[in-house]
Amino acid sequence: MTQGLTRRNQYTYTLTILITPMNPGRLGIYGGTFNPIHTGHLIIAQEIYEQCKLDRLLFIPSARPPHKHHANISAPEHRYQMVELAIRDDARFEVSDLEIHRPGLSYTVETLTALHHLYGSSSLFFIIGADSLLEIDTWREPDQVFELATIVVVPRPGVDAYKANVRWRDQILMVPSPEVDISSTDIRKRVEAGQQIQYLVPHQVEAYIRENGLYKSGGN
């Protein structure tokens, strides 16, 4: 194993312990709030890993996503720990605290730039949902995002990504995968209401939510 890497340029960032010191040839990037991570996220990750023939897939919990309201988002440290628990027994997957330790909002272009400096010889595959594709032209420096990575789009229930009017259509990889109708919002509501979330999240994540009082009134 190699210890966490730190590099500084126009962006400041860190990476947690990596399983292998060698640059993966094809690296999947799965960013999100993961508030909390659930079974649907893991199914998507597995499908993308196999269909895109990735060598490694990196989960990156966002600290302060620019397109989401922050009031109902648990502390980044909690969300990072839940991802770590969910994937710790799968050698294909890793989790990074890159965005958690970077000040300010979590912009994709900054994350991909940082990863490009770390893994210059790797091909980056950035995973987004079809709903995000519909608003990608509102992201910071979208043209640069497409220069840094192949954008992999996965289905979302009720969203027809093929109708998206984006000028980068020929740079998008549409990957069919099961449409798993599980949402973090619904999971949070179920916890708040005292309902079961078994099978919606890995059991380690369910235990972590319970032990830390997450998504209850007054929880973190």
Region roles according to the model:
Residues 8, 13-220:
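Nucleotidyltransferase catalytic core that binds NTPs
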